């Protein structure tokens, strides 16, 4: 009778310790993505200051997101073999430098260099931070990924709001104030890095005990390609909102820049809520169901959006953000379970592709807007969620025994 009692204590202590780390890494994800989201939020200022067209705006997004995407799988592969606990703080230092450069960039080329620094910082941050979230999950991988992601989405929602009330009134040089946010994140990530360093050995042992799916390599590769296509459909649509929605509202409805930024904030807030809901729901009903609903299920609303009034545009974008954003946590955890023991590589690959698809999409949509109209862009993008039909070809890898308890 005495032996079960000591065994029960570690179970209660471990989750309490993990929640602190999960909260810290989620907060830093929020700070990182807040700083990332400042870039599209200040596009109207940059467009006026440097006399840019939509194609050049798209190139800014392309530069930032490609630098953020190309390094992520590489960072993930390296850290799978040899973890780098303090790379989190180093990555945020790159972001800090980029913000300071952007605040005083004398030319358009200097703007591109600055946003590249911000992108490199993000590419270093995401694979290792996702690994820390999984390590601190206590076996509740869906919940941990959801909490981690909702921090990022909350930051993405807050960035445009802060830009509307800080950068728009005070100009481009006020971007330097956001370097304070990056410094705070560096301090927190240094503490997280120390915790991570102390748990690396435990993490290595857990990786060797990873579950196997029993699915052939060919099917795993096919499933990964399908998941990437789902990320493509989701992220290209979302980047059409984050990069061009303010211009769409100003052009179609004649709203002010600040009002358009507030509409964008509402959309991003709905996306943050959807991200938080998606993880726990995926743990309960299965991640494939979440992917079905979050991508294909949003199709009727995206098809209606280009023809809606201002009021219904806001209603529809809230629904789209809430439903579509729930997909990414499910996709990442599903991919991690497809390839056990490769958390860094898988996280880097999918975060990287998410950024890369977004960057390429932003550039192409910018060119499309210049050659046609901003309204036409949203008519084209409205069909992207139809790619969600590919979810039917994903394998079933979520047996009922694969639960947090069994972990």
Question: Which sequence ranges carry the predicted segments?
Answer:
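Residue-level signature of mid-helix packing/kink "hotspots" within the transmembrane helices
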Residues: 37, 65-73, 156-157, 268-276, ...
């Amino acid at each position: 009778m005495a032996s079960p009692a000591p065994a029960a204590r570690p179970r209660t202590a471990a989750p309490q310790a993990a929640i602190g780390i999960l909260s810290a890494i989620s907060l830093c994800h929020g700070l990182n993505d807040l700083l990332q989201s400042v870039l599209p939020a200040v596009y109207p200022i940059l467009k006026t200051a440097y006399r840019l067209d939509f194609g050049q705006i798209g190139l800014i997004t392309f530069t930032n997101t490609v630098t953020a995407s190309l390094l992520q799988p590489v960072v993930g592969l390296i850290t799978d073999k040899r973890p780098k606990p303090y790379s989190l703080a180093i990555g945020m230092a790159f972001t800090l430098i980029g913000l300071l450069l952007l605040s005083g960039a004398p030319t358009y080329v200097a703007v591109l260099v600055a946003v590249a620094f911000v992108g490199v910082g993000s590419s270093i941050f995401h694979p290792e931070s996702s690994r820390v979230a999984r390590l601190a999950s206590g076996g509740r991988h869906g919940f941990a990924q959801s909490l981690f992601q909702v921090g990022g989405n909350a930051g993405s929602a807050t960035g445009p709001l802060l830009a509307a009330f800080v950068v728009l009134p005070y100009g481009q040089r006020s971007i330097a104030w956001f370097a304070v946010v990056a410094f705070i994140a560096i301090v927190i990530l240094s503490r997280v890095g120390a915790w991570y360093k102390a748990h690396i050995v435990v993490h290595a042992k857990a990786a060797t005990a990873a579950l196997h799916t029993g699915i052939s390599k060919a099917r795993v590769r096919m499933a990964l390609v399908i998941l990437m296509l789902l990320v493509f459909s989701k992220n290209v649509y979302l980047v059409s909102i984050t990069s061009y929605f303010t211009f769409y509202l100003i052009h179609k409805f004649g709203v002010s820049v600040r009002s358009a930024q507030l509409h964008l904030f509402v959309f991003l807030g709905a996306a943050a809520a959807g991200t938080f809901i998606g993880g726990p729901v995926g743990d309960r009903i299965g991640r494939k169901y979440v992917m079905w609903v979050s991508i294909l299920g949003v199709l009727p609303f995206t098809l209606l959006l280009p023809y809606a009034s201002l009021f219904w545009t806001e209603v529809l974008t809230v629904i789209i953000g809430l439903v579509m954003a729930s997909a990414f946590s499910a996709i990442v955890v599903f991919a991690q379970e497809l390839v056990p023991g490769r958390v860094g590589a898988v996280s880097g690959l999918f975060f990287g592709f998410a950024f890369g698809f977004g960057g390429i999409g932003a550039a192409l949509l910018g060119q499309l807007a210049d050659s046609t109209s901003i309204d036409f862009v949203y008519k084209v993008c409205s069909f992207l969620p139809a790619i969600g039909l590919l979810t039917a070809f994903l394998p079933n890898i979520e047996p009922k025994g694969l639960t947090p308890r069994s972990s």
